[in-house]
Amino acid sequence: MDRVEKHDLKIDAGLHRFLVDEAMPGTGIDPEHFFAALSALVHDLAPKNRALLARRDELQAKLDAWYREHGAPVDLDAYQAFLKEIGYLLPEGPDFSVSTANVDAEIATIAGPQLVVPVMNARYALNAANARWGSLYDALYGTDAIPDADGGTRGRSYNPARGAKVIAWARDFLDASVPLAAGRWSDVGGLAIDGTALSLTLTNGTKTTLRNPAQFAGYSGSAEAPSQIVLRQNNLHVVIVLDATTPIGQADPAGISDIILESAITTIMDCEDSVAAVDAEDKVVVYRNWLGLMKGDLAEEVAKGGRTFTRKLNADRVFTRPNGETLTLPGRALMLVRNVGHLMTNPAILDRDGREVPEGLMDAMVTALIALHDIGANGRRANSRAGSMYVVKPKMHGPEEVAFACEIFSHVEAALGLPENTIKMGIMDEERRTTVNLKECIRAARDRVVFINTGFLDRTGDEIHTSMEAGPMIRKGDMKQAAWIGAYENWNVDIGLECGLSGRAQIGKGMWAMPDLMAAMLEQKIAHPKAGANTAWVPSPTAATLHATHYHRVDVAEVQAGLGSRPRARLADILSVPVAARPNWTEEEIQRELDNNAQGILGYVVRWVDEGVGCSKVPDINNVGLMEDRATLRISAQHMANWLHHGIVSKVQIVETMKRMAEIVDRQNAGDPSYVPMAGRLEQSIAFQAALDLVLKGREQPNGYTEPVLHRRRLELKAKQRAS
């Protein structure tokens, strides 16, 4: 690997070229200044980074010893006393409110869906950024949100019977969201602008208007024959498209051809769990796509339906307000960027002692440099109109680590000439030590925090690893009913509201991981806004459009105001360990659990290691497509490692299960021309060996993380490919 030496750093030549030739021009940042500042950041803060990781290991060793002696805690007072004694559970300070300034409305006041997308994939990133608006008709027609029964089947050509069901669903939605003063939306035969009001004519000739006239926000076209009508509910916009020249509009009494919903309000461009970036070559792909998003020039050639077109970022949408002034609505989701956590290093840059630099330090400096194209002195202000950069910081353990992230951001701001606290922080509440000390974690970032989010997948992985020695864990499918998880979800909202996040920041909930099951999502995911979350994760732009309907039905600000008076969730419940009281499962139940875990692990790992794909829709054992990333992998691997450690299963049984499941995963991937089967070459398959490592060496992995094994094995495969 060719390297360029700058200020005691040895930088991969390709990364250096990208930074100097592509990222820096237009920012006002001099290359020598940048590399000197990066070197200072690395050499000042890397030792502290390593010390924090050593502290994680020290606490885990003490927990392991305690559990080996006591088993799962029965006397919770004694358990809490122990956690306080070792510095795991910290004293809680006085009440306070966060004071984060210059926060965009998309985060502070608009409640709605949030997408998370691998920024390594330009097409996915563009789709996610453009998912601010989505067709409700398309989202309903193309998914199981509308049942196939009674002639409503999806086919290759348009099915009018299904279309009628879609239109009926959408009209019912309008009745609930923007009701009329008289009549129903299904009876509307015409729309026009009368002065500053929306006038609707029903099919029986009756004139009506909106029950709440203030919900009329704007229009395009002429007042007599508008082409679009903009309505508003709970800070979210609905665009009714009027076009009688289209087949749908022609058949509609009012000429309505579509209903467009404001959908993904925010999108996290992910450099972490959904990507496979193990070296400088990969990191340049990550950073180049982020650069394209910040400069607004990211584009991708897309082939669809026999034609090729260029996908790029959508422009803002411009309408006329009822009073005749211009209404401009953002055309794109507000973009946050998720940097990696504190754990991993990356060979892209070496320090003065030849050590790989902490990847989180590199991400902070480079993603912020690139953000100057949006928020710098000459920035476009096309993403953040408030002039802020939003960084989601994952996998932090406790307030010391949050404070360290703030210190990193302060260094970066000083280096890049940004005012203090320009870089805002999203705190992923996905590690047990952060959960139990959440108030102090928020306090450590009180001037930066814009987001707390329950990541129940990683949080479950940490729950298993933290209490690995306590006994065999309950089955994975039972985990959602365990006492700790409900308390954890409520605690996050309770603490967030106590710390004044309402109206200032996002309180988020986790991912709907079944992108094909939209009817179930429509039924179940409304629980998130009802629980006081003003955002929640969805797996696709289509899911964002459907989930947006929940925020029309639920006024989250009102819910949060009501929750402020409830008692806080119980810490004792959060600290309860999900060990099986009577691990008397049948052999069939044990094998089914193993099959399910092994199949999920292999289905994800084979694409990660062999193809560098960090986020996949992996068919489960029942062929239901599940969105898998490193968080779901962490749970499955740790669960198998736990059962192995406690003798529920044997090593022989695990290896035999993995071999059988490899054949199933091979069959599930038979249609992928780039797929390399594992069966028949298990010893040679680096992906299969990685999957075995994750389970058989699961107890040894730091906090149960999968990154060390995945990175090592992916680098091994890339080296093998280069050698051949």
UniProtKB/Swiss-Prot annotation:
One of its GO terms (molecular function) is malate synthase activity. Pfam families: MS_C (PF20659), MS_N (PF20656), MS_TIM-barrel (PF01274), MSG_insertion (PF20658). Acetyl-CoA binds at residues 116, 123-124, 274, 311, 539. This is Malate synthase G. The lineage of its organism: Bacteria, Pseudomonadati, Pseudomonadota, Alphaproteobacteria, Hyphomicrobiales. It catalyses: glyoxylate + acetyl-CoA + H2O = (S)-malate + CoA + H(+). The active site is at residues 338, 629. It is found in: Cytoplasm.
